Amino acid sequence: MNKKIAALIILAGACLICGPKTHAQASTAKPAAASDSQKATDQDIALLRQDIGSKKKQLIAANLKLTDTEATKFWPVYDQYSAELAKIGDQKVALIKEYANQWGTMTDDQALSLIKRSLAVDEQIAQLRIKYVPIFNKVVSGKTVATFFQYDRRFQALIDIQLASQIPVVQDQP
């Protein structure tokens, strides 16, 4: 697999924000070498995701004005939200892996399937946010909920922009 696609997959892991998840890497090397390479990449992605998740939480903690009482109630809900977001993120990683594996041989049907499933993942993220608005609002004010989701969306937008800049365009396939 070329370096650009490998970098794409590692960056994709970053976009998923929290928790260790899996990743497969296509390789023409011997199976044992491919397995070792995949394990190393999986570990890199897991560490990167944990680091980004931690930094996101620090960013929110530094910018979201919470009283001690609010913080005690907010952070468990945030952790639950982040865990559900990471599960959706697993689907995003799977799509990026599939895209990387099909790069250079992708058919029209495969391209359409990938974009439809990618949009479905985006929709799931939006639905998760909608689901959590009233849950967060039970523990903090409406303004705080709105501010949290502004930061959450800004953080994700930055990652998405970086990721999009690294993903080769479908029509650019050899």
For each of these PLM feature ranges, what is it?
Residues 17, 21-22, 65, 112, ...:
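Generic hydrophobic/packing signal
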Residues 13-15, 116, 141, 146:
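Generic secretory/membrane-interface signal
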Residues 17, 82-85, 122, 156-159, ...:
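A short hydrophobic/aromatic micro-motif that marks alpha-helical segments and, especially, helix-coil
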Residues 1-50, 164-174:
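Classical N-terminal targeting signals for secretion and organelle import
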Residues 38, 45-46, 56-139:
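Amphipathic alpha-helical segments
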